[in-house]
A protein has these predicted regions:
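Acidic/polar-rich alpha-helix caps and helix-coil junctions
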Residues: 1-134
Length: 134
């Protein structure tokens, strides 16, 4: 809805997710005897002021809702912000993680995965070419 400009419907859908997330009856301890979460999740009471504000709210909600699902990278690539977000993360984390000292995300290359050479060998180089940057 947000991408088509219907910010109010987008806000409604985001708030539905937030209402469900803060409902602790869905998050119980293993024996189901007590709440396992103490979320402080609020809804968006005011209409979004702009499409950009709505998009940012949607992206944050998706980040929270889909945490640990293994799809964040693909969201960042689809939204065209992978280089910005990943390089900001690397810049912050390399202070604490020595293996990130020379790491960087290369826009136009790292959005893609290399095609296994075995597949290129099977198909032939005329039919199948490597992704850009590989």
């Amino acid at each position: 809805a947000i991408e088509t400009g219907d910010l109010e419907t987008g806000r409604k859908y985001i708030n539905m997710i937030r209402e469900r997330a803060k409902n602790t009856q869905h998050v119980k301890t293993m024996d189901q005897s007590q709440d396992a979460a103490n979320y402080k999740v609020g809804v968006y009471d005011e209409p979004f002021k702009s499409k950009n504000e709505a998009v940012q709210a949607l992206r944050m909600e998706r980040r929270l809702e889909m945490a640990h699902e293994g799809i964040r990278f693909f969201d960042l690539v689809r939204w065209g912000v992978a280089d910005e977000v990943i390089n900001a993360y690397i810049a912050k984390e390399k202070v604490f993680r020595s293996h990130l000292q020379n790491a960087h995300f290369v826009k136009g290359k790292h959005e893609y995965f290399p095609i296994p050479q075995s597949m290129i060998d099977i198909c032939g180089t005329e039919e199948m070419k490597h992704n850009p940057g590989y």
